């Protein structure tokens, strides 16, 4: 269990004036150097190690800019991810992804992000990849800054698995949605504990699911009615 009697947060509060008057979501535009490196990796022009080195360099540069801007909470810009939310899900057992053929509707165009779906019972049996991502960031913490880890909210995870194109796969392994909800919750507990053990004291849950649910076209998209969305 997590012991909150004495944490890095308490030490941080003693050295930095709180509450903060400003913060940022933590996701930043990828520099051209990083975007090119990812393309080169996908086309097998560079190795995974070379891509990681470039990610490290770009994150280091970003953190310097964050500190120069006066931010008390720093992030890695989500520079190691393909998308802001799906990479986190890919770190769970029972979740797979493939290149999309149709994309996901987004503001009148198709976002060509990987189709992500369930291929087994959801859980976390090993160390989640985001833990190592966070450990790299902790080297930049000082008396004025603390590292923040951003992850999609559990509701975002659930919504991904009940989207029309993913629902068929989900039903193969979960006849009861409540069972899926519980497995997702248990998986989050494991990852949060792993992050805590790695020194993380600031986690941000990003949730865009509500915006989709209140859209007037949501019942049609989810093949249900207003009551079904509740």
Where in this protein do the model-derived segments appear?
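Domain-level signal for soluble alpha/beta catalytic cores
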Residues: 3-230
